[in-house]
């Protein structure tokens, strides 16, 4: 559980991250290098009172977005690709953790937008069920069912895949192979009891993703939220998230 003062520090870290995101959405274009985006973020974070990144940033364009912990950040961003950026500023020893996936040329293709909106739908659904009393394992199973439905709508899994799946390795895990949420605070992966029910004033990330290796497309979205008795506060709620908001900010 986080004290009010801790949540204030986390909000400040998220606000600095917002400044960085707003800067790079105007900067990204075909031909830029991933590490140039990293440099722009670093400058904006430091300018706003952060000591830098809260963790090693992931700036992954094209097929590299399907590598979950890609940290080379050394490739050219190409026209037509989507770039996945998992980044966050530190402030006062507290971490923020954000992921956005944006079109290098400022405009999603229809397929990219369809996948993006499926991830967004799961993200919003996950935020809606992460409440005091739920166990993280139960929560992730519910999120898995949401993801299964979205993958069916995208034509990535069908009923046959679902009927024959191993319960220990559901069909959706081919395209969404990581957890949905983790504690965040002094550490980006903060200490917390995952076998105990979620409590009020816990702070979690919410970060579903869909990774389609055969299409060279990986999309993840992530915000940090504070859990309340009857809802949540999205610490990153003012950062562009909808596909149209991303495109508008880039253009």
Functional labels for PLM-detected ranges:
Residues 1-251:
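Active-site neighborhoods and metal-handling regions in enzymes and metal-associated proteins
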């Amino acid at each position: 559980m986080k004290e009010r003062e801790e949540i204030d520090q986390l909000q400040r870290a998220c606000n600095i991250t917002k400044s960085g995101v707003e800067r790079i959405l105007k900067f990204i274009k075909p031909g830029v290098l991933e590490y140039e985006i990293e440099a722009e973020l670093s400058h904006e974070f430091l300018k706003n009172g952060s000591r830098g990144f809260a963790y090693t940033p992931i700036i992954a364009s094209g097929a590299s977005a399907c590598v979950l912990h890609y940290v080379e950040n050394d490739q050219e961003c190409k026209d037509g690709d989507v770039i996945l950026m998992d980044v966050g500023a530190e402030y006062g020893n507290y971490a923020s953790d954000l992921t956005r996936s944006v079109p290098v040329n400022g405009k999603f293709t229809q397929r990219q937008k369809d996948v993006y909106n499926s991830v967004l739908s799961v993200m919003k659904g996950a935020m809606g069920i992460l409440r005091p009393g739920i166990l993280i394992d139960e929560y992730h199973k519910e999120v898995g069912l949401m993801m299964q439905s979205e993958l069916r709508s995208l034509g990535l899994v069908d009923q046959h895949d679902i009927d024959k799946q191993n319960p220990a390795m559901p069909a959706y895990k081919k395209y969404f192979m990581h957890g949905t949420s983790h504690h965040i605070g002094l550490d980006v992966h903060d200490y917390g009891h995952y076998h105990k029910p979620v409590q009020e004033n816990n702070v979690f990330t919410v970060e579903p993703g869909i990774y389609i290796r055969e299409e060279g497309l990986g999309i993840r979205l992530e915000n940090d939220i504070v859990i309340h008795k009857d809802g949540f506060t999205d610490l990153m709620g003012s950062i562009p998230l909808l596909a149209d908001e991303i495109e508008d900010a880039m253009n």
